[in-house]
Amino acid sequence: MRPMHGTTVLCVRREGRVVIAGDGQVTLDKTVMKATARKVRRLGEGQVVAGFAGATADAFQLFELFEKKLKEHARSLPRAAVELAKQWRTDRMLRRLEALLVVADREHVLVLSGAGDVIEPDPVANGAAVAIGSGGPYALAAARALLAHSSLDARRVAEEAMKLAAEICIYTNGNLTIEEL
């Protein structure tokens, strides 16, 4: 049995608002297994939003670990992210987890990987955006264009960019879960 794959998660920051949007499609090989999965959630007593791309069970384990790191480091998103990335990279069992995380609070947007990466995207005209997953490049390109050439708020930028990604990427659908700070 092949692993489930394919998703799109987009984070947009604009004018003090932060939005993470994730599509709902889960595929197994060439079959859509679920259309309404929730790949985005709130953490840190509602002060952090997070989304994942990759194996679902792996992502849930990483969400739990990240929640613990947030508590250990007084809800400092950058510190918790670095500590999780270090543990993820060095722990023999965690190293096998296949997922990417996008985490954000009102001040930071970060991408975490099992390779130990903690990446904060560069700001673009009138905001910032980062995307992961199979539809990530499409959503990111659309979000950057909308940030640069429209006055849409963060939520509308995310919705429109995800709509475009769903039209292009066969592993992405239009059933969105959106969390906003």
Curated annotation (Swiss-Prot):
GO CC list: HslUV protease complex; proteasome core complex
Keywords assigned: Allosteric enzyme, Cytoplasm, Hydrolase, Metal-binding, Protease, Sodium, Threonine protease
Catalytic reactions of this protein: ATP-dependent cleavage of peptide bonds with broad specificity
Main location, first listed in the record: cytoplasm
Gene Ontology process terms (BP): proteolysis involved in protein catabolic process
Subcellular location: Cytoplasm
A Pfam family reported for this protein in Swiss-Prot or TrEMBL: Proteasome
Binding site for Na(+): A166, C169, T172
Keyword Metal-binding: yes
Enzyme Commission numbers on file: 3.4.25.2
Molecular function GO terms recorded: metal ion binding; threonine-type endopeptidase activity
Positions annotated as active site in the UniProt record: T7
InterPro entries according to UniProt: ATP-dep_Prtase_HsIV_su (IPR022281), Ntn_hydrolases_N (IPR029055), Proteasome_sua/b (IPR001353), Proteasome_suB-type (IPR023333)
Keyword presence, Hydrolase: yes
HAMAP family, A to Z: HslV
Described function: Protease subunit of a proteasome-like degradation complex believed to be a general protein degrading machinery.
Subunit details: A double ring-shaped homohexamer of HslV is capped on each side by a ring-shaped HslU homohexamer. The assembly of the HslU/HslV complex is dependent on binding of ATP.
Family membership noted in the UniProt record: Belongs to the peptidase T1B family. HslV subfamily.
Record's protein name: ATP-dependent protease subunit HslV
Species in which this protein is naturally found: Anaeromyxobacter dehalogenans (strain 2CP-C)
